[in-house]
Amino acid sequence: MSSAIETKKVVVEEITSKLKESKSTIIVDYRGLNVAEVTELRKQLREANVEFKVYKNTMTRRAVEQAELDGLNDFLTGPNAIAFSTEDVVAPAKVLNEFAKKHEALEIKAGVIEGKVSTVEEVKALAELPSREGLLSMLLSVLQAPVRNLALATKAVAEQKEEQGA
């Protein structure tokens, strides 16, 4: 076999493993973005621990078939870039959605969220969710509210008894 075919097989395996290992994968059309904008997008994604790569559609299609992600091939037309995140489900959706709001040339096409092919609407809905840390802080404040109310009520009763005793 030629070395070109071997190289392509390695790339397909790489894409397949990233599709399977990532918690969140988003496909975007980057047509119309200039070099400075793409560089800025890559920087923002890197800061969020998201890998952003451009692959040939034919190789991506083969990887999608190997990863058994039916329905994703429909979105693999034109120039595409793929954002992979193995840590945070929300991070790539959030960064790409914010960037797409500022730069209309970036178009979110589809995504794979925890192994399930997702539409643009689902990706955008995911982007609107708070981060894991934000959700945890909300949960913590909800859990602390009854304790705080009990402490305030106890303090009020103590002050009331103090006034009656004085």
From Swiss-Prot:
| Cited CDD domains | Ribosomal_L10
The scientific name of the source species is Bacillus licheniformis (strain ATCC 14580 / DSM 13 / JCM 2505 / CCUG 7422 / NBRC 12200 / NCIMB 9375 / NCTC 10341 / NRRL NRS-1264 / Gibson 46)
Q: Name the gene for this chain.
A: rplJ
* Alphabetized InterPro entries for the sequence: Ribosomal_uL10, Ribosomal_uL10-like_sf, Ribosomal_uL10_bac, Ribosomal_uL10_bac_type, Ribosomal_uL10_CS_bac
Q: Name one GO molecular function term.
A: structural constituent of ribosome
GO CC annotations on file: large ribosomal subunit
PANTHER family linked to this entry = 39S RIBOSOMAL PROTEIN L10, MITOCHONDRIAL
Which HAMAP family does the UniProt record give? Ribosomal_uL10
What Pfam family is a match, any one?
Ribosomal_L10
Q: Which Gene3D superfamilies match?
A: 3.30.70.1730, 6.10.250.290
- In Swiss-Prot or TrEMBL terms, this protein is called Large ribosomal subunit protein uL10
Disulfide partners = none
Q: Which UniProt keywords apply?
A: Ribonucleoprotein, Ribosomal protein, RNA-binding, rRNA-binding
Q: Which family does it belong to?
A: Belongs to the universal ribosomal protein uL10 family.
Q: Which classification does the entry list for the species?
A: Bacteria, Bacillati, Bacillota, Bacilli, Bacillales
Self-association state and partner proteins as the record states:
Part of the ribosomal stalk of the 50S ribosomal subunit. The N-terminus interacts with L11 and the large rRNA to form the base of the stalk. The C-terminus forms an elongated spine to which L12 dimers bind in a sequential fashion forming a multimeric L10(L12)X complex.
**Function, in words:** Forms part of the ribosomal stalk, playing a central role in the interaction of the ribosome with GTP-bound translation factors.
Q: What is one GO biological process annotated to this record?
A: translation
